[in-house]
Amino acid sequence: MSFTQPNLLFPPTVLSVGGLTQYIQTLLEQDEELMQVWVTGEVSSASQHRSGLFFTLQDPDERVALRCIVWASQLEKLSILPVPGEQVILLGRIRVYPQRGEYQLMVWQALPAGEGLMALRYRQLRDRLETEGLFDPARKRPLPPHPQTIAVVTSPQAAAWGDIQRTLSHRYPGLRVLLSPALVQGDQAPDSIVAAIERVEKDGRAEVLILSRGGGATEDMACFNHERVVRAIAECSIPVIAGIGHQRDESLADLVADVHVHTPTAAAQLAVPDLAELYTEHCQRLDHLITAGQTRLALAQNQLQHQNRRLKRLPLERQLVQEGRAIAHLKQQLIQTVSQQLQQRLTHQQLLAQKLQSLDPRAILQRGYAIARRQNGQILRTIAALQEGDDLTLQLSDGQVKVQVRKIMAAGTGHEAESEQMEL
């Protein structure tokens, strides 16, 4: 009994092992996707030879492995050296080895995965921007000593915004504070921060800019290491204070800013002087001026008395001639010295008087501000304790006005006394 297989089960040609391997090699090595491919995984083993580094890359959660090789001539070009147990990202191409019927990844570059990759990118960008001179101390600009308008770039919902407002109003009443709102976390934060800085530039009123946010995880601060944000700070026409709430590492925004501190409150303290401290300093200088004048006058009186005693001890005629010359010389010298000292003290006193006048709370009232008091004289600082019908007294620059509360509006429905939100 015979059995005949249908002809269709036997193709006209049958591939040899070499032919099949060559076919697979052609498919893999000529595939454009595999000529330059990025692969990530964990290094499970590594062996160093004269010809190069041989290691295995695998997925930690799966039983899948890929043999890899870095030729000796390429080792020095790697950003990191693959070490067993570490997560890496590899760049290379697929090569087939017919003798063993295997394929391998021929590696050109190795990068750290996860946080290691972020750190590598940070170092590379920092080095490039430093080479351009963006972090050069010579680029740093001094802060204005007495700014009248300050812009703040931060999130309106962030605690940093409240901290900055409270600090500025306490240290420098009457200061104009402009908020240019921005996202300070997430993928959209870099573009949002750049747009907020550009709005401040276009508005043109601010004399200094505070870029701030509260503390957070390292990944939350990534937007402050973005190249567009760094260049926007560098190109800003007014001094920039970076008040980013972190202690461990400096962001690139810190390095390029004119001044940087670690908290929003510290940034606000740095932006404006304390008026109370300025007044104390003025009083001290005035006391010093008065003391110096009194000391100079007492010295002149002592010199005059000394010359008078010498005059009495000389013969009359000779005494008159000598003392006349001495008195004339002393008089001329005294007049010149006192005149110079007096002119210097008067000029200094005028400067101090002008500064004191500019810091006088009454000058703030003359610019259109008012102080609201209850009937018992208590100053109102918030609407939270007000009720409709309450009687108030408004202190203006030239008198007082008795008013009654008819309607209470929250900050979003009216104008704030010391801060306003930019809608540009």
From Swiss-Prot:
One of its GO terms (biological process) is DNA catabolic process. The keyword rRNA-binding does not apply. It is an enzyme of class 3 (hydrolase). It is found in: Cytoplasm. One of its GO terms (molecular function) is exodeoxyribonuclease VII activity. InterPro entries: Exonuc_VII_L (IPR003753), Exonuc_VII_lsu_C (IPR020579), OB-fold_nuc-bd_dom (IPR025824). Its main location: cytoplasm. Keywords: Cytoplasm, Exonuclease, Hydrolase, Nuclease. GO terms for cellular component: cytoplasm; exodeoxyribonuclease VII complex. Its EC number is 3.1.11.6. The keyword Cytoplasm applies. Pfam families: Exonuc_VII_L, tRNA_anti_2. Heterooligomer composed of large and small subunits. NCBIfam families: xseA. Belongs to the XseA family. This is Exodeoxyribonuclease 7 large subunit. The gene is xseA.
